[in-house]
Regions:
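Charged, amphipathic alpha-helical regulatory modules used
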Residues: 1-107
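Conserved catalytic cores of very large enzyme subunits
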Residues: 87, 94-445
């Protein structure tokens, strides 16, 4: 009866003793000697080959057999031989991946480890980002299982790996070492520019420097994240700089011409040009994220939500945020962004409307009507309802508590800094199917 072994790629092959003898002979020759028939027979006799055994297990047995027979130098050379072949196989795997990626119809089908990555174009930049992903996956899994074993024991660490490999759970962004996502306050940027995060830009002083600096700041922060970067204060800060140039009542005369150039731009046109600059720039691919755009989230607030979170907020010069002008700016941005999406595919920002509820209804009727109006016009955004403005929601983050652990500057900056290290997803479909097939209640399982 023929004995079959399992190769590294999972394929079955008929067992050949000659291949083992050949590898052992090479190890002896590398040690400056050779194996006699008696020596070879003694080593082979220690092997226990059975149907379905893996190549790795056979090679492990050969190492043990060589040391048991006293051929320690030969065993060492055999291990080196295995290591070099492993490296050769990894190199060949990389070369195969390179060719397959180049021949793939698109970036998703060409990606071996991360087909869900937000990559639209297939080019050298995306290819460079794909190459090290298998190494990152191994490193991330090793770090996490080591920590689980240290905190809860080896049994749970092994269970985690089993659930992962059997696809009961999915660990997001194992192909990156960076944290998953973060909601940030931009207050340090107002004080020190980008110096706190390794940049050299000075704080913004006007509307133009705010827009340009904001883009750079978001790109810098996002380069250190594998997921989203949320800026809940974006429109509030923009409103502050607009007010510094045109007065806090600028929205009352938005059609006023304020541009001395031939274009004769109005205040409204200046503002929408700023929208265009920021949104289109952030939707561009970036080398720091393997030719992906950043994942950017923003928030809108009704009056009560805004006052609850930013009521005591003060800008560095001591000025309070002006709600009336911000109210106009929020609505103007939503209207502009919804219309702009008819002209171009703009994924970001991902928007969340935060509404305070009372007795089962939205407290701010003006924003309840406006939210419904935007949905009726076909706009796509999240709506977060809460009866207590103690939390924020951004995109997939259902609820971020900010009352107890929120970031707060002594000048009164709102507590909007939060985020997550990583995200773990339960594969409910797989879980239910497995439980049913095993005759178990999927609810209990």
């Amino acid at each position: 009866m023929e004995t079959h072994i399992i190769k590294r790629d999972g394929k079955s092959e008929i067992f050949s003793i000659d291949k083992i003898k050949n590898a052992i002979n090479k190890a002896f020759i590398a040690s400056g000697t050779f194996a006699t028939e008696e020596t070879m027979a003694a080593i082979i006799s220690r092997l226990r080959i059975h149907d379905g055994i893996s190549v790795e297990e056979i090679q492990n047995q050969v190492e043990v057999a060589l040391m048991a027979e006293g051929y320690y130098q030969v065993a060492k050379n055999y291990m080196i031989y295995r290591y070099r072949h492993t490296k050769d196989r990894e190199t060949m795997d990389k070369l195969d991946f390179l060719m397959n990626y180049c021949n793939a119809s698109n970036a998703a089908t060409g990606s071996k480890y991360d087909a869900n990555a937000n990559v639209e174009k297939k080019n050298i930049a995306t290819l460079i980002g794909e190459l090290p992903k298998s190494n990152y996956i191994r490193l991330n899994r090793r770090m996490l299982t080591d920590r689980i074993e240290k905190m809860f024991g080896k049994e749970l660490a092994d269970k985690y790996m089993a659930l992962l490999k059997q696809h009961f759970i999915y660990k997001n962004d194992e192909t990156s070492l960076a944290n998953y996502c973060a909601s940030i306050t931009m207050y340090p940027w107002l004080l020190e520019g980008t110096k706190a995060i390794g940049g050299n830009a000075t704080p913004p002083t006007n509307l133009k420097s705010f827009c340009g600096g904001f883009i750079n700041m978001v790109f810098m922060v996002s380069s250190m994240l594998s997921g989203a970067c949320a800026t809940p204060e974006f429109l509030m800060y923009m409103n502050y700089f607009i007010g510094k140039e045109y007065g806090n009542d600028y929205y009352l005369h938005a059609d006023k011409v304020v541009d001395l150039s031939k274009r004769q731009r109005t205040i409204d046109k200046v503002i929408t040009d700023c929208f265009e600059q920021v949104v289109y720039s952030i939707n561009q691919p970036t080398g720091a994220r393997n030719f992906q755009s950043v994942f950017w989230n923003i928030s809108y607030y009704d009056r009560y939500y805004f006052e609850s979170i930013f009521g005591e907020f003060r800008f560095p010069d001591g000025e309070k945020p002006d709600w009336d002008s911000l109210n106009w700016l929020q609505k103007r941005f939503m209207k502009w962004f919804n219309a702009e999406r008819l002209r171009s595919v703009l994924t970001f920002p991902v928007e969340t409307m935060a509404l305070l509820s009372e007795n089962g209804d939205v407290k701010d009727k003006e924003y309840a009507d406006f939210t419904a109006e935007m949905y009726a016009e076909g706009h796509s955004f999240f709506t977060y309802l809460s009866d207590n403005a103690d939390s924020l929601a951004s995109c997939c983050r259902l609820r971020n508590e900010i009352t107890d652990n929120g970031f707060s500057y002594t000048l009164g900056a709102g507590g909007v800094s939060t985020g997550s290290k990583s995200v773990l997803t339960i594969n409910l479909n797989r879980t239910v199917q497995y439980a049913v097939r095993q005759g178990m209640s999927y609810l209990t399982y």
